[in-house]
């Protein structure tokens, strides 16, 4: 969102916290900081060291080369929006396109991996105790299933786009929760009209709001938590567009301590509700003094992924946090400044790089997993045709791209040990825990084990080993899965140029003990 433009138009004093409140804020660099992991240490493979005095002979039995082809693995991808805070595509809003056609065209784009919905609370619930999902939901879910894509979403409690005519909250909740005027509508009110009134925010700390928020999350989780189509869910945050700020306007909270306590409670509730699908927490700095720093810490310790809704105009603190997040957490990036992807209107710098490409390639600097493409499918296709380098670079490097770059067979303990060096040619660590399976074609041998969370990190490798049953000779298929949430595993395709089996595994041949290619002391 262009919150800094709103700040310029607001010309309002923010709520200033007390010196005592600021003194309690835990400030630290994220680089080198130990947040802890919420993944239990289960069935860890031996990860070395694998020294020369451990074995009675060895040989390299598999080595692979990295592929730059796009992969549709969980935990990474380009996000195509079927709905954003202003609605669907501009053509749908103007009556020139049907909603069905918009969703189908977005889902049909070959470079889109995930379909994303960002809607208001009123778009998912009309009365207490039940979900009333707007048509965009079924259309998006059906298109994702049809085209082999996934779905992510955010439900907003606050949205400037339709104010003052329409607020984000459903009517039944607006009647129960005190609503606070925080200042005259700026440039992002209804149709850009700045003469129609004030921005209105709910009292997020009110018991009716908190109760309804918990109920909504329970209902959404009952429907979507663990659904294989759902990639991630944005934490329901406070503030404009659910980003955790009020863009320079005063906070609707009575004081900073109430805001901090309320937001921390909201985050803990959502972490407790969503067990199988990753949550994503906005890393918005605490410009509105609402306890964002503490809430982000709670979310990260609870295993939530991180996200930012802009990339170039962010403060230094947010860039440092995103780049140095725990490596087992994914990062989601977007920027709404040039969201229409109108290629002919883009400025090009002296190096011949257009503005949007400059923006999106910073995703790689942040070792991120996702980049958002917004709603304009026809413009996206035209942009990619005119400037193909940006999307191509992201799809070749963004997120994690793992493969067994070496596999050694060693004589050890009277049997064969397989040591796999799993390399990651992506920029990000594995968003969760990587599990490896060594399996014989008949299934009689089925060995599994995991690496440490996040390993192999971006542009790094990690070793792990299996001990095979005595006397086994022949084919072993090596397979990968990602534990994306505790006890939730999803298959991962190896990012190598060598051919894979139909199940995504890679075959290797275990040699007999009398094979002439054993090495020792050489």
Label for each model-derived stretch:
Residues 5-23:
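N-terminal export signals
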Residues 26-114, 135-139, 143, 225, ...:
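Non-catalytic accessory regions flanking glycosidase/transglycosidase catalytic cores in CAZymes
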Residues 34-101, 111-113, 145-149, 231-243, ...:
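Catalytic-core regions of glycoside hydrolase
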Residues 109, 117-183:
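Aromatic-lined substrate-binding rim segments of carbohydrate-active enzymes
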Residues 121-131, 197-211, 252-257:
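The substrate-binding groove and active-site-proximal loops of carbohydrate-active enzymes
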Residues 140-145, 198-232, 262, 266:
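An active-site-proximal structural segment forming one wall of the substrate-binding cleft
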Residues 159-219:
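Active-site-adjacent "subsite" loops/lids of carbohydrate-active enzymes
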Residues 396-522:
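Extracellular/luminal regions of secreted and cell-surface proteins that mediate adhesion/ECM remodeling
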């Amino acid at each position: 969102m262009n919150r800094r433009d709103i700040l310029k138009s607001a010309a309002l004093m923010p709520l200033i916290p007390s010196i005592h409140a600021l003194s309690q804020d835990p400030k630290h660099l994220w680089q080198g900081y130990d947040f802890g992991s919420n993944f239990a240490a289960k069935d860890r493979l031996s990860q070395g060291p694998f020294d020369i005095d451990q074995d009675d002979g060895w040989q390299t039995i598999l080595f692979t080369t990295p592929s730059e082809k796009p992969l549709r693995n969980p935990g990474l991808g380009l996000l195509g929006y079927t709905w954003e805070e202003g609605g669907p595509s501009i053509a749908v809003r103007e009556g020139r396109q049907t909603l069905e056609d918009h969703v189908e065209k977005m889902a049909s784009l070959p470079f889109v991996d995930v379909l994303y919905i960002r809607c208001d609370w009123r778009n998912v619930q009309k009365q207490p105790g039940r979900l009333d999902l707007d048509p965009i939901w079924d259309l998006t879910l059906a298109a994702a299933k049809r085209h082999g894509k996934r779905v992510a979403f955010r439900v907003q409690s606050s949205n400037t786009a339709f104010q003052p005519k329409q607020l984000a909250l459903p009517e039944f909740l607006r009647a129960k929760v005190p609503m606070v005027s925080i200042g005259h509508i700026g440039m992002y009110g209804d149709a850009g009209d700045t003469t129609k009134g004030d921005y209105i925010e709910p009292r997020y700390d009110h018991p009716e709001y908190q109760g309804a928020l918990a109920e909504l999350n329970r209902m959404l989780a009952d429907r979507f938590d663990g659904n294989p189509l759902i990639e991630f869910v944005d934490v329901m945050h406070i503030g404009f567009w659910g980003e955790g700020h009020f863009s320079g306007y005063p906070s609707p909270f009575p004081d900073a301590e109430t805001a901090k306590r309320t937001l921390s409670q909201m985050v803990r509730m959502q972490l407790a509700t969503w067990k199988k699908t990753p949550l994503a927490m906005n890393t918005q700095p605490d410009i509105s003094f609402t306890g964002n720093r503490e809430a982000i810490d709670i979310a990260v310790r609870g295993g939530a992924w991180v996200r930012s809704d802009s990339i170039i105009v962010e403060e230094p603190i947010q860039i440092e946090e995103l780049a140095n997040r725990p490596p087992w957490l994914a990062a989601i990036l977007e920027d709404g400044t040039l969201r229409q992807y109108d290629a002919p209107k883009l400025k090009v710098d002296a190096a011949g790089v257009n503005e949007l490409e400059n923006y999106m390639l910073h995703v790689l600097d942040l070792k991120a997993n996702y980049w958002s493409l917004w709603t304009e499918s026809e413009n996206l296709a035209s942009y990619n045709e005119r400037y193909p380098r940006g999307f191509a670079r992201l799809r070749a490097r963004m997120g994690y791209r793992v493969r067994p770059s070496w596999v050694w067979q060693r004589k050890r303990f009277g049997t064969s040990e397989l040591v796999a060096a799993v390399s990651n040619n992506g920029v990000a660590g594995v968003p969760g825990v990587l599990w490896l399976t060594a399996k014989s074609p008949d299934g009689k041998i089925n060995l599994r084990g995991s690496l440490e969370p996040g390993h192999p990190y971006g542009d790094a490798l990690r070793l792990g080993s299996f001990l095979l049953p005595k006397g086994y000779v022949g084919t072993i298929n090596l397979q990968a899965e990602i534990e994306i949430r505790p006890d939730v595993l999803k298959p991962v395709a190896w990012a190598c140029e060598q051919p894979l089996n139909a199940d995504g595994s890679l075959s290797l041949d275990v040699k007999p003990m009398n094979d002439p290619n054993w090495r020792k002391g050489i």
